[in-house]
Curated annotation (Swiss-Prot):
Family designation: Belongs to the DEFL family.
Cleaved signal peptide residues: 1-20
One of the record's GO cellular component terms: extracellular region
Major localisation: secreted
Disulfide cross-links: C39-C81, C49-C71, C57-C79, C61-C80
Membrane-traversing stretches: none
Any GO BP: killing of cells of another organism
Entry superkingdom: Eukaryota
Name this polypeptide is given: Defensin-like protein 108
Compartment(s) of residence: Secreted
Keywords: Antimicrobial, Disulfide bond, Fungicide, Plant defense, Secreted, Signal
Length: 89
């Protein structure tokens, strides 16, 4: 009888701990939130990165109100602007 009560108590603790994980307001769910980006398509996007630095891309994005910009090799050296996170109320 004691073993049964101990077993049920253990199961109850495990089940309740799985359902009670807290999440943050800015990133609901689990894992790491990937950064939101807008990549400039076509020749304009590659032209901004053709100098070998991200300076032109960064200036392009900042002037247009984005949080920043970088050249990414996995998008064929395209300029990608970082979208600022939404403001929390």
């Amino acid at each position: 009888m004691t073993s049964l009560i101990a077993f049920l108590f253990t199961v109850l603790v495990i089940v309740s701990s799985v359902h009670c994980r807290m999440t943050t307001a800015s990133t609901p769910g689990y894992g790491i939130k990937q950064e939101d980006r807008l990549c400039i398509q076509g020749q304009e996007g590659t032209k901004l990165c053709s100098s070998g630095t991200s300076r032109d891309c960064l200036n392009f994005c900042l002037i247009r109100g984005y949080a920043g910009g970088s050249c990414y090799a996995y998008t064929l050296d395209q300029c990608c602007c970082r979208i600022p996170p939404p403001k929390l109320k």
